[in-house]
């Protein structure tokens, strides 16, 4: 009888724990990235991370940012830099030193309580940064 109770308790515990884990696994980060020129080929970036479902700020994560040019894969890429937490929860700051102007795909890697990767493609010009324009699609 004791063995049956133990099995029932373990089964109930698993039933309660598994949904919580699956909910945590579904949490995704949303990233708003704003960059501005800070010098020749250097850009100061502010990243605001939120939970994509609840819109709550994601504080306490380790954020690293890498970049590469989608038009020239593996030719131009930037070693990832660690972002520093900003003044408000969920806000992070980093300086990117790029190799040239143009479209860069930023890879935002989150570690800690939430592990995720967010990709954002931006156009870095000498005087401003804006969302990259999408290449025209061709139908054949």
In which residue ranges do the predicted regions lie?
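Positively charged n-region of N-terminal signal peptides that target proteins for export
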Residues: 1-5
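Bacterial N-terminal signal peptides
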Residues: 7-19
